[in-house]
A protein has these predicted regions:
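Short, flexible loop/turn motifs enriched in small residues
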Residues: 1-3, 26-27
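Conserved hydrophobic/aromatic positions in well-ordered beta-strands
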Residues: 6-8
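DEDD superfamily 3′-5′ metal-dependent exonuclease/proofreading module
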Residues: 1, 10-16, 38-200
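Short, surface-exposed acidic-centric catalytic microdomains
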Residues: 15-36, 40
């Protein structure tokens, strides 16, 4: 279930941020509330209808694709798979750029965490109000910019189709390696799925 939806549209230098609080209709776990600061009570009192928020989020994503924009989403298989599960019919019809995947593919053996906070530190991006939805969306976009412009300029030479294929192949390879590792440790690997930008 969605608690906050934040979409930051960056188009030719113009920035438009839209964040919406949703009432998920279920209890928000205390641990999650401590991270993002939104309690069940706050969501119920101030949040909009959950299904409306999801529908408007999907419509905004599709509008961005229609306008020729690229969707930057940190850990795309998680968020986009959630949208598909919530709507039943969400599909990817435009370009996606996943800063987490790019980082894992380009710097595979770097030790340490790869959450958004640590990635901002690694790429020299300022992150204000971590775990606040709009701040996280801005930060993901800035990390993507740094990756393409400063660290991996070869990505800028790819067209949309090539970039999508590159990410899908890299994700498949990374997941296959992860699956083999789990199996070598006698661990269940059934949830290690290869699909990108959506699982399955």
């Amino acid at each position: 279930r969605v608690v906050t939806s934040a979409l930051v549209r960056i188009d030719d230098g113009a920035v438009d941020a839209d964040e919406t609080l949703a009432d998920p209709g279920v209890e928000i776990p205390e641990a999650a509330a401590k991270v993002h600061g939104i309690t069940t009570e706050k969501a119920r009192a101030e949040g909009r209808d959950h299904d409306e928020v999801v529908r408007e989020t999907v419509e905004a994503i599709k509008k961005g694709w229609e306008d020729g924009l690229t969707l930057v989403v940190f850990n795309a298989p998680y968020d986009l798979t959630v949208l598909r599960q919530l709507t039943g019919d969400f599909t990817v019809t435009g370009p996606v750029f996943d800063p987490l995947l790019i980082d894992r593919a380009k710097d595979r053996y770097r030790k340490g965490p790869r959450n958004l906070t640590s990635m901002c530190q690694h790429y020299g991006v300022r992150l204000d109000n971590a775990h606040e939805a709009t701040a996280d969306a801005f930060a993901a976009a800035r990390v993507a910019w740094m990756q393409v412009r400063k660290h991996y300029p070869e990505l800028a030479q790819m067209d949309t189709g090539e970039l999508m294929e590159y990410q899908a192949v890299e994700y498949f390879t990374l997941q296959e390696d992860r699956k083999k590792y789990f199996e070598s440790q006698g661990r269940d690997a059934s949830n290690v799925l290869p699909g990108w930008p959506m699982l399955g």
